[in-house]
Amino acid sequence: KILLDLINDEIERSNIDRNEVYIAKSKSNTLREIDASQFLEEQGMIIVETDLGDRILQLKKDDNSPVHPTGPASHLTVHDIAEIVNESMNLDLPVEPRPIMEAVREDVLGLIEKSSIGISGTNSIAAEDGAVLMVHNEGNISLVQSKKLHIIVAGIDKLVPLLEDCVSIGKLETAFATGKPLTSYINIVAGPSKTADIEKKLLKNMYGAEKVAVILLDNGRKDAIKECLWCIGCGNCVVNCPVYNVVGNEFGYHSYLGGRGVALSKYLKDNKGSVDSGLYMCTLCGMCTENCPVLTPTNKIIEDLRNTAQKDGLSKDQHKKIRDNIKEKGSPY
């Protein structure tokens, strides 16, 4: 509701035709968590994904769930992507990455020219400094945050004390997600654009956003065990997960993939949500923890959640049968 109220205020303030409300959006697992795009589209708004991977999935329309936090379309081949782009944009591009990238870029730039609203997530928020930090390679977030209204939606788990902490998290995520020490861009936003170049008088609304709004999302996080909120979103756990590499994004919850997504779903939804997300798929091998930059004990969390699920009667039918056989026959068979 807060998100919609902010957008409606901007529509009225800028006298935007309600039949042509374009919103420039960057990649955000938090926005996926609350189905922000679907919700806004149901209000008649046109969402334009600016991240290349997200835009490809948006054009795909069906069976378009992301498979990695930083590489949402990494499961698609260049042949798949060429077919998606050619069909959705009525083009005849060759099966080559560069012409596909250029076609999507020109299409996105043309659409977001019509927008005065940008929405994004963030990598971290410096509570004491009053600033948010975003890391990206494509430069698309710079376009999103230059709109008249820039709305940032973030879970309360993104809060850290200082800007220095934000930078450390951004560097750590980049290293474990891409193997590089830094992304191409690190954006820090601490308010609307402004200048003091004329007699040192502070004037707002120069080139960037005229208004910046930050929405902090709880959605069950306050009740979660603290280890569930350590995640920095690098995706290294799913790359090294034997289960995820077999079943894909069926193992996880919404945009939170793998065992960590299963664990978090207990608090974002409920015990049954964690079972439906793959609570019993996990092998408890611990590869996720071993490859996690912050050593989130995901396998231990899942083991504890299984105990809770068992107490609530949320066992798999096969497990119930084994248990009953042991009780009645003294054997699982």
Give the location of each predicted region:
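Catalytic adenosine-cofactor/nucleotide-binding cores of aminoacyl-tRNA synthetases and other
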Residues: 234
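Conserved hydrophobic/aromatic pocket- or pore-lining residues that grip, position, or stack substrates
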Residues: 130, 241, 333
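Generic, well-ordered alpha-helical scaffold segments in large soluble proteins
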Residues: 6, 10, 39, 43, ...
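Flexible, glycine/charged-enriched surface loops at secondary-structure junctions
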Residues: 1, 17, 176-186, 241-253, ...
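Phosphate-binding glycine-rich loops and their immediate beta-loop-alpha structural context
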Residues: 231
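The feature marks the mature, well-folded catalytic cores of soluble enzymes
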Residues: 1-223
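Residues at the N-terminus of the alpha-helix immediately C-terminal to the conserved SAM/SAH-binding loop
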Residues: 32-33, 237, 288
